[in-house]
Each structure stands twice: as C-alpha cells, then as structure tokens.
Amino acid sequence: MPDDRYPVPADRHRVTQEIERSRFITTVAPAATLEEARAFIDEVRAEFPDANHNCWAYVVGPPGSTAAIGMSDDGEPHGTAGRPMLTALLHSGVGDIAAVVTRYFGGIKLGKGGLVRAYTGSVQQALETLPTRERVETATLEIVLEYAASKRGQPADQRVRLQLKQYRL
C-alpha cells in the first residue's frame, strides 16, 4: 500500500479481557502527531489512575513506519509490554495509531512469557475489531499572482509565488 493512502483508526476503540484474574483494558485511538499520541496516553492514564500499569505504544505515520514510534512498559519487567505492543502495531497494517493497555493485577504472576503473550494478545484483540477509515495525503498547489501598481512608463512588477501545502484528510 502506498504511503499516501493507508488505514487509520476511525475513532477510539476499547476491548477488555481477563487473563489469570488480571484485567487488561486495551484502548486504541488515532494519533496523527506525537502530540496527539502523548495526549491520548495521558488521558487514558487519568481515566485509570488506580491501575497497576498503563503500558503504551504508538506509531505516527504510515503502517510499519519507524520514523515516529514510542513505547513504555510502565513498571512491568523490561521488554514484556511496550515492545510487544509496538510490534503488534507495526505489523497491523494500520498507521497513525496509539494503544494503551491498562492492567489491574489479579494476584497471579504471569511470568515474562505470559506478560508478552497477554500484552500482544490484548492489542491484537483490539485491532481485530478496530473500525478504520482511509487516510489520503493530498497536495494542494496555490498560485498567487501579485501585480504592483505601476507609474506611467514603468512596467508593472509581476511576481509569482508558488506554495505547496500538504493536507491529511
């Protein structure tokens, strides 16, 4: 799929699953900029302030792009939450996306492998039912012709200014 046309989340989407008495709440949202991704993560954290963990990952840009990515294990053992979540997003075929998995610990330790499977599975479950829309990048060319007032006998000053604007629809 070309970089100028790709699926993005249509809106926020949430799924919940229970694994070994721990509750995993996955929230996915569109994030066309780093600021949008960070604001979304902060909003979910504020919504679940009593959670044991709010792990997150995002991909800003086309599907699979690594130009603007981020992740956090938020207190889980290193590499057991953020990285698996990011990998799921990178392989999803969806761009401009952020995900937060909120975990309420249920009393049973999952181990590193269990955590990787739980966080990967949580994001994949959300992606399976995620409504998407197509993002199309377009270029608009604006041409402005300016004519200066001329005095008798002097040629009019003519300038052409070209301006290329990028829009994401």
Model-derived features: positions:
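C-terminal regulatory domains involved in ligand/effector binding and gene-expression control
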Residues: 1-80
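Generic alpha-helical secondary structure
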Residues: 34-37, 78, 82, 116, ...
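Active-site beta-strand/loop microenvironment that shapes enzyme catalytic pockets
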Residues: 81-129
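Short amphipathic alpha-helix segments
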Residues: 144-165
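Short glycine-/aliphatic-rich beta-strand segments at the starts of folded cytosolic domains
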Residues: 133-149
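Short cationic amphipathic helices and targeting signals
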Residues: 27-29, 140-145, 169
